[in-house]
């Protein structure tokens, strides 16, 4: 199956290549000196590959959620397996800092880290509040958009942990009102406004924010989008907004076929049943058979409390979905890397 190419900014790829080249030169230099000075030793007995693999797999792992940026400027949550450790929240922030290793890990997914290179963190979590003390390198973002993404990514990454409800910021131990390009860091921040769509008009009292998922154009990742609505924040409203799709200039894919209509939404016993018009069957013509579109719909629905399953009808008749498994997370690093091998292009 042929998948669209991933777009990476040239500056990101150049940073990775420069760092890797420097590391290679240093390694060869050290190796050359060792060859000149060290006496010959008998090679050590080779350890069977099966034993080393077993040793590696025996390491205790835990899951964490890292927020990266894609080529269109969206923040994308990715679930990664990391070695079990104390201070996992601080370690998660470290994975979002630009470096040779982090850049390469993100590039495999078509993404980039959001925190400037060299940034370090001190983290204090108490009674549901996380205070993040960033080093001065955090002030070195390229522009306001990257700065806002950094703040939002840190807040959302930390509030993935049950022990954190809100986040505040310091820079080099000092309270600041704003970052270099004007992004406010004077208050405490919660999980709102992830990839917020620009409202079509000025918002008024009664506005609410709902979150949906849409496929990225390369087909590999699902991107969460926050949309302002007027009305009830319930699963029926979410399905209706999902059917409308992303904004035309968003860079995201419209998940459902053109012309499909919503005939009804009902909830019973933890299952939401959605009835679409006959045009829905064209979803099977998508390059992946509609798998990512269905996963996006399932994630949009199951984020509502009590909903655990999604059932699709077409003109009132049951429709066999291309995937029956309800995803537990939008993007799992190991799955993205293995299921959707890609060729990266440089812009």
Task: Annotate each language-model stretch with its function.
Residues 1-347:
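Bimodal "functional hotspot" detector
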